[in-house]
Curated annotation (Swiss-Prot):
This is Small ribosomal subunit biogenesis GTPase RsgA. Its cofactor is Zn(2+). The gene is rsgA. Residues 102-272 form the CP-type G domain. It is found in: Cytoplasm. It comes from Serratia proteamaculans (strain 568). One of several proteins that assist in the late maturation steps of the functional core of the 30S ribosomal subunit. Helps release RbfA from mature subunits. May play a role in the assembly of ribosomal proteins into the subunit. Circularly permuted GTPase that catalyzes slow GTP hydrolysis, GTPase activity is stimulated by the 30S ribosomal subunit.
Length: 349
């Protein structure tokens, strides 16, 4: 007797259930109270399934089991853990509780919803570069994410050494768009170290996460900032001619900068999906729009070609950058497109 073919959505759910059963039957070592020391505070350096690397107050790192009652644990979480008496199959302790987060960075996934990928972030470093391409649209997307998450952004333009004087002047003008609306912008080079001292100062005493497209030099910057003992973030071979790199990071991990501050390097922030946001949230995330909200002729103004739009009027007078205004509508269009695909996928499942 023939069986009906499973839809893609059903196949995903079957596979997910199978993986959950595998985890439940995993014979990982368990530590009871007699094998555990006193509770102490620590920070999650990295997460691996039902294990986490936890850094203790003295700087030592310990591979720990995670209590099954802890549903969400990510890099950057401040936790209560108990060291084991000895080592059991490579496990040195157990994470028992998670302190309240000051912030959480979520990654929207078209299939699995919104997932946390890092916690207690103080700032998001938006790394862009003049090669492979300086994309103001991508910077604006990251800024929307930062404003929505209420995490302070820092815009860093890398590979500035590849510009001649005329091109440098043009790029400075583009970056002034962001300086004029209150964002911090640094222009740096990991090769010549131009701007790196100011960058180090901006990173001190904070937990940062680097965001940016592949090839903008995130890993090169991190390696320039990390102490020699921690240079585990590798960059694929880079052409001296093109100056282009490739994304190589594979797992979220917290590192300590040699001049102070920490970074969580995660593959989950190559791009921020914004499809889970409402259009009103994107509008609010444009800081220069806020003074004009409520000033439009119509309450349901889309801030496009609507008559009496205060935001478009401000753009036409030069009070709002045309580039930012156009990217605002590109973001809304891309969000609508992804939502259509997601709704189609959900219906197919």
């Amino acid at each position: 007797m023939s069986k009906n073919k499973l839809s893609k959505g059903q196949e995903r759910r079957v596979q997910a259930n199978h993986q959950r059963r595998l985890k439940r039957t995993d014979n990982k070592p368990e530590l009871d109270d007699s094998q555990l020391g006193e509770p102490q505070d620590g920070i999650v350096i990295s997460r691996f399934g039902m294990h986490a690397d936890v850094e203790a107050a003295d700087g030592t790192q310990h591979r720990c089991n995670i209590r099954r009652t802890l549903r969400s644990l990510v890099t950057g979480d401040r936790v209560v853990w108990r060291p084991g008496v000895g080592t059991h199959a490579g496990v040195k302790g157990i994470v028992e509780a998670v302190h309240e987060r000051t912030s959480v960075l979520n990654r929207p996934d078209i299939y699995d919803g919104v997932k946390p990928i890092a916690a207690n972030i103080d700032q998001i470093v938006i790394v862009s570069a003049i090669l492979p391409e300086l994309s103001l649209n991508m910077i604006d997307r990251y800024l929307v994410a930062c404003e929505t998450l209420e995490v302070e952004p820092l815009i860093v333009l890398n590979k500035i050494d590849l510009l001649d004087a005329e091109a440098r002047k043009t790029v400075d003008g583009m970056m002034d768009i962001y300086r004029h609306i209150g964002y911090r912008v640094l222009e740096v080079s990991s090769q010549t170290r131009e701007g790196m001292e100011a960058f180090e100062q901006a990173l001190a005493d904070r937990i940062s996460i680097f965001a940016g497209q592949s090839g903008v030099g995130k890993s090169s910057l991190l390696n320039a900032l990390l102490p020699p003992s921690d240079k585990q973030i590798l960059v694929n071979q880079v052409s001296d001619v093109s100056g282009l790199g490739q994304h190589t990071t594979t797992a979220a991990r917290l590192y300590h900068f040699q001049h102070g501050g920490d970074v969580i390097d995660s593959p989950g922030v190559r791009e921020f999906g914004l499809w889970h946001l409402e259009p009103e949230q994107v509008t609010q995330a444009y800081v220069e729009f806020r003074d004009y909200l409520g000033g439009c002729k119509f309450r349901d103004c889309r801030h496009d070609t609507d008559p009496g739009c205060a935001i478009r009027g401000a753009m036409e007078k030069g009070d709002i950058a045309k580039e930012r205004f156009e990217n605002y509508h590109r973001i809304l269009e891309s969000m609508a497109s992804v939502k259509v695909r997601k709704n189609f996928t959900d219906a197919a499942g």
